[in-house]
A protein has these predicted regions:
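Membrane-proximal alpha-helical signals and transmembrane carboxylates
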Residues: 1-188
């Protein structure tokens, strides 16, 4: 191989590496194509899971939601797995579900079993749920809790977050986040 061929190959590899790093080979999803979840409710059913999402930006929703106004809605989906239930919500909205802004996870009372940790771990690793997201447990159904009409804000998830943040000094109300949940679970 001649010296010019080696230089050409090296130059090509450098250009290729720069193109890979800086030209964004991975397609980017526009914000208008995302269903931004601010509150997530998970219930265990006989057939699998029921997931309720309080979503901002459900514009291309084709049905199945409740309370849609001012760019937000509560949309539910069911499936044998969490992924299937979230996929149903994505199909109903026509948008890609994004949990990276979800700061509240409500677990239904029937959900508190040994599967709690793997399910929360799956959400954090697959959908990038923030580690400071609050985890709350509903007395009955997580969907019922998210359906409640808040007094101070338009989104019940935001009202619950504010209430739980302000109640952390009260010893009768236990509030935890994803990070503390993992720390407590893994330290057993």
């Amino acid at each position: 191989m001649s010296r010019n061929h080696k230089k050409a190959i090296i130059a090509f590899l450098i250009v290729f590496a720069v193109a890979l790093c800086y030209l964004r080979v991975v397609p980017e999803t526009a914000l208008s194509e995302r269903a931004i979840v601010v509150g997530l409710g998970i219930d265990k059913t006989e057939k699998g899971y029921a997931v309720s999402c309080e979503i901002i930006n459900p514009k291309s929703q084709s049905g199945g939601g409740q309370g849609e106004s001012d760019g937000f809605a509560l949309i539910s989906g069911t499936g044998k797995t969490l992924d299937a239930a979230i996929g149903e919500i994505s199909q109903k909205t026509g948008l890609k579900v994004s949990l990276s802004q979800c700061n509240l996870i409500v677990l239904g009372n029937m959900f508190l079993t040994e599967q709690t940790f793997p399910s929360v771990n799956y959400l954090v690793q697959t959908y990038a749920v923030p580690e400071l997201a609050i985890i709350a447990v509903a007395e009955n159904s997580a969907a019922e809790l998210l359906k409640t009409k808040p007094v101070m804000t338009t989104l019940s998830a935001l009202q619950m977050q504010q209430t739980l943040h302000s109640a952390t000094d009260d010893a009768s109300i236990i509030s935890t986040n994803v990070k503390d949940f993992f720390k407590g679970y893994l330290s057993r």
